[in-house]
């Protein structure tokens, strides 16, 4: 069955907390960077406990970075990686498509969208979806970006650790070019300056 969390932010916070509990202590982040991450996790837990309204819920793809879409000749974008579908908040998919840590993941389609490009994409998305979804998603856009950043950051911490060992996350299962790109992107995303920049973006 397709997952359908009754409290999407609370479910995301629980998964992120479990990941950070396992991988953050040995991540080698600076004290300042660790403090930022822990502060944002506290924010997410507090926000999730207050935001219990599940709507608007739609079928979401979860892993909505640019590399998981194919652009057809008629200009339509088709999602091609249906590994993690869930009935969830569409704003989480929207956030995953535009925040830098997620948008830069793919070796060929990865990008670092500037603020103008990000905002233009969000505006186009809001105009394309049903009005009720747009209206109910708008107040959650910034919160969704923060939540998805934490989810993705936790994934990167796990990938950096487990990609170095044998197993399903091993970098040896990837081509050398893809493995090198993922490693560069993960290390850049875990850099102090990248973490500080993300924290600044949360206020914009």
Regions found by a protein language model. Give the residues of each.
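A cross-family kinase active-site recognition segment
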Residues: 1-42, 48-59, 84-89, 165-184
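All-alpha amphipathic helical-bundle segments outside canonical DNA-binding/catalytic cores
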Residues: 4, 132-148
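ATP/Mg2+ or Mg2+-diphosphate-binding catalytic cores
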Residues: 27, 132, 152-204
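A ubiquitous short alpha-helical element
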Residues: 29, 83, 107-111
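Active-site acidic catalytic loop and adjacent metal/ATP-binding pocket
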Residues: 43-92, 98, 105
């Amino acid at each position: 069955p397709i997952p359908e969390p009754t409290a999407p932010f609370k479910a995301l916070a629980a998964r992120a907390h479990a990941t950070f509990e396992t991988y953050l202590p040995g991540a080698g982040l600076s004290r300042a960077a660790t403090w930022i991450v822990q502060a944002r996790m506290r924010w997410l837990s507090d926000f999730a406990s207050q935001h219990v309204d599940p709507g608007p819920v739609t079928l979401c793809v979860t892993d909505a970075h640019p590399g998981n879409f194919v652009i057809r000749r008629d200009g339509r974008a088709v999602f091609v990686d249906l590994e993690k579908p869930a009935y969830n908040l569409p704003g989480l998919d929207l956030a995953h498509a535009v925040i830098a840590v997620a948008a830069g993941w793919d070796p060929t389609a990865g990008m670092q969208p500037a603020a103008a490009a990000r905002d233009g994409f969000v505006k186009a998305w809001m105009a394309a979806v049903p009005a009720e979804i747009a209206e109910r998603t708008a107040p959650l856009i910034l919160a969704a970006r923060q939540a998805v950043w934490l989810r993705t950051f936790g994934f990167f911490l796990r990938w950096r650790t487990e990609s170095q060992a044998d197993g399903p996350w091993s970098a040896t299962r990837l081509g050398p070019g893809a493995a090198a790109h993922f490693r560069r992107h993960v290390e850049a995303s875990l850099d102090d300056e990248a973490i500080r920049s993300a924290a600044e973006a949360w206020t914009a």
